[in-house]
Amino acid sequence: MATPAVKVYGWAISPFVSRALLALEEAGVDYELVPMSRQDGDHRRPEHLARNPFGKVPVLEDGDLTLFESRAIARHVLRKHKPELLGGGRLEQTAMVDVWLEVEAHQLSPPAIAIVVECVFAPFLGRERNQAVVDENVEKLKKVLEVYEARLATCTYLAGDFLSLADLSPFTIMHCLMATEYAALVHALPHVSAWWQGLAARPAANKVAQFMPVGAGAPKEQE
């Protein structure tokens, strides 16, 4: 079997690496996940710094092209292989995808990441949860999710009545959030909850979720 032309470097438990993998899975692209160890400092080795001078993951190699930053990777993959997930070249739809991608990057993800770091990843980092940080960011996330609820009351997906990267991009960090007791923030909002359940049921999302065994840091809400 030929080696896939596309390689992704990183550890799949990372929601950033998994964001890139989700785009590849949705686009049906054959790829190789090149495993790395954060604990062993693989991301600080010269060969990886040559791929990404910031020493972060993921990194994607697509033939002679090397990319870093998970959202840039996802855009490249979909632009090349499944442009309908970016709005399909239609000006207004593409603009709405861009708007809600910016909302995810600057409004949703920062508080969600802060909660997930404390509730899920702090034990792996050898420290206790900082509940003050959690509480502060829960309030921020509530307000963002209320905006999502209002938007999703008017259309099936964030950019309109079509699935796009604007919906897929938050999946991996929300997957981590849903492994904590703060999944209740999503369940409390019917349109957000239905949107989330639809995303989580997608085959590509299911596959990527298997790479992300989260939930060690906090009890999962009982259903």
Swiss-Prot record:
Tagged with keyword Ligase: no
Residues covered by the GST N-terminal domain: 4-85
Catalytic reaction equation(s): RX + glutathione = an S-substituted glutathione + a halide anion + H(+)
Induction: By herbicides.
Domain GST C-terminal: 90-223
Keywords of the record: Transferase
Stated pH dependence: Optimum pH is 7.5-8. Active from pH 6 to 9.
Domain of life assignment: Eukaryota
Molecular function terms from GO: glutathione binding; glutathione transferase activity; protein homodimerization activity
Binding site for glutathione: 14, 43-44, 56-57, 69-70
Gene Ontology annotations for the cellular component aspect, listed alphabetically: cytoplasm; protein-containing complex
Modification type Blocked amino end (Ala): residues: 2
GO BP terms in the entry: glutathione metabolic process; response to herbicide; response to xenobiotic stimulus
Tissue expr: Seedling roots.
EC number: 2.5.1.18
InterPro entries to which the protein is assigned, alphabetical: Glutathione-S-Trfase_C-like, Glutathione-S-Trfase_C_sf, Glutathione_S-Trfase, Glutathione_S-Trfase_N, GST_C, GST_Phi_C, Thioredoxin-like_sf
SUBUNIT field: Homodimer or heterodimer of GST-I and GST-IV (=GST-II).
Function: Conjugation of reduced glutathione to a wide number of exogenous and endogenous hydrophobic electrophiles. Involved in the detoxification of certain herbicides. Most active with substrates possessing a chloroacetamide structure. Trans-cinnamic acid and 1-chloro-2,4-dinitrobenzene are not effective substrates. May play an important role in the benoxacor-mediated protection of maize from metolachlor injury.
Recorded family membership: Belongs to the GST superfamily. Phi family.
PANTHER family: GLUTATHIONE S-TRANSFERASE 4, GLUTATHIONE S-TRANSFERASE RHO
Protein name stated in the entry: Glutathione S-transferase 4
Protein source organism: Zea mays
Lineage, highest ranks first: Eukaryota, Viridiplantae, Streptophyta, Embryophyta, Tracheophyta
